[in-house]
Swiss-Prot record:
The lineage of its organism: Bacteria, Pseudomonadati, Pseudomonadota, Alphaproteobacteria, Hyphomicrobiales. Its EC number is 3.6.1.27. Disulfide bonds: none annotated. GO terms for molecular function: undecaprenyl-diphosphatase activity. Belongs to the UppP family. One of its GO terms (biological process) is response to antibiotic. NCBIfam families: PRK00281.1-2, undec_PP_bacA. It comes from the Bacteria. Bacitracin is thought to be involved in the inhibition of peptidoglycan synthesis by sequestering undecaprenyl diphosphate, thereby reducing the pool of lipid carrier available. This is Undecaprenyl-diphosphatase. One of its GO terms (cellular component) is plasma membrane. The chain crosses the membrane at residues 5-25, 43-63, 84-104, 106-126, 184-204, 213-233, 248-268. The keyword Ligase does not apply.
Length: 268
């Protein structure tokens, strides 16, 4: 393994794990790191499997809660309604994502300027929503009605534009629909599970002919980095947003997006 490949794998894996579950857009950070810092993905297999690292991180952290929900399904109406709400929230992105996958990957992912602009605009919107004197009507994800979940799922579709952030879109939508900050972030976690698994499966299928494990060491480094970083973020995010809200993430988006535009203007 070349030193540059090891460093790239480590950096990209950390970026994926650290940014996947917070409202700053992991896609934007990975693409901008590649554009400006030269941290190119070692290949299609690597790009697909670091996503799996982040997915396994959230499944591990939420394993006990998921098991409790599964065991309660036969007897609990509340558990069944919650699972239905998550699935109905997942449906819009599943349908649109499957239909528009090629266009999104081929066109939108190749426009760094668009990504930077979306980062800034999304940051401004998130900052504004975080500052609104909203009165939450829902403080527990298990009390979210399916109609609310569907609306949050429609917001998630905005994340197909690189730079938007899947968690950012769902959290912003949830807050506007009357949830509190902590439960908005937690519902985003639950919605991430089928959404990320679906996106991973689709990417795996689309890249099936290009998959190769020749650089298994590099792939393992990126996978482990994404997995460990993802665990750290998932375990700490709910308490963080309960006390500090989403303003720090909004500011970060604006700073990164602005720096990206300046970089594109200076060096292209």
């Amino acid at each position: 393994m070349a030193d540059q490949s090891i460093i790239s794998a480590l950096v990209l894996g950390l970026i994926e794990g650290l940014t996947e579950f917070i409202p700053v857009s992991s896609t934007a950070h990975v693409l901008l790191a590649g554009h400006f810092l030269g941290f190119k993905s070692p290949g299609n297999t690597f790009a697909v499997l670091i996503q799996l690292g982040a997915i396994l991180a959230i499944l591990l952290v939420y394993f006990q809660k998921l098991l409790s929900i599964a065991l309660a399904l036969p007897t609990s109406v509340k558990a069944r309604r919650f699972v239905f709400s998550v699935l109905i929230a997942f449906l819009p992105a599943a349908l649109i994502g499957a239909a528009a996958h090629g266009f999104i990957k081929a066109v939108l992912f190749e426009t760094p300027m668009l990504i930077c602009v979306v980062l800034i605009v999304g940051g401004v919107i998130l900052y504004a929503i975080d500052r609104l004197p909203l009165q939450p009507r829902y403080t527990d994800v298990f009390d979210y009605p399916p109609s609310l979940a569907l609306k949050i799922g429609l917001f998630q579709c905005l994340a197909m534009i690189p730079g938007t952030s899947r968690s950012g879109a769902t959290i912003a939508g949830a807050l506007l629909m009357g949830t509190d900050k902590r439960s908005a972030a937690e519902f985003s976690f639950f919605l991430a599970m089928p959404t990320m698994l679906g996106a991973f499966t689709l990417d795996l299928y689309k890249n099936r002919d290009a998959l190769s494990f020749d650089d298994i060491g590099v792939i393992a480094i990126g996978f482990i980095a994404a997995f460990v970083a993802g665990i750290v973020v998932v375990r700490s995010l709910l308490d963080f947003v309960s006390h500090r809200g989403f303003t720090p993430f909004a500011i970060w988006r604006i700073v990164v997006g602005t720096a990206g535009l300046v970089g594109l203007w200076l060096v292209g």
